[in-house]
């Protein structure tokens, strides 16, 4: 199939933010009384919003997940992202190449909050290529694995979801792209990324890349 647009996830696809965000979250959960390891924290929260796991957090900490706690999390997370964030290897070149090939018909469709997504894309120099085609699941009726954010992104680039290629690194994200009616490719660098190739394929990815350099060839 010849694709007419590419819709990118952000975290773990364009920017290497997950270890940073997970580190802050793990530290704060331990401070709140949940003795969770970094590995378990990544497994539980990858591809999800913190608030979507509020019941689990409250069960382990014995206290409600408050707006004040979330505000502190955002502040600490953003400070570390500003200081440490880097682009995924090869993501910059891939975005430039597909942007040129597709006449700018690319979008970023993230499950994260808009401030985080826009800040990250600015920091790694990719924001100009997405311009006003940046979408946050926080602003949709439902976030990933619901298809809403991908449906909004497809509408913004003026391409039917069935003619869009989605790039995702988590099972939750792959499910969202599939539910939108798009073709989804996974990204799982070696050693294994945030979703194993097997798990991404089981969720509906038709192909799993280990290198962003593969993306241009997948356009058809």
Each model region followed by its residue ranges:
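Asp-based, Mg2+/Mn2+-dependent phosphohydrolase catalytic module
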Residues: 1-4, 96, 102, 113-220
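Active-site neighborhood of HAD-like aspartate-dependent phosphohydrolases
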Residues: 1-43, 60
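Short, acidic loop-to-helix structural element flanking the phosphoryl-transfer center
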Residues: 79-108, 114, 118
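Conserved SAM-binding loop
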Residues: 14, 87, 106, 166-167
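A metal-dependent, Asp-based hydrolase signature
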Residues: 46-80, 89, 97, 105
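An amphipathic alpha-helix signature
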Residues: 22, 26, 50-55, 70, ...
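Conserved G/P- and acidic residue-centered "switch" motifs that form tight phosphate/ATP-binding loops
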Residues: 9, 13, 110, 169
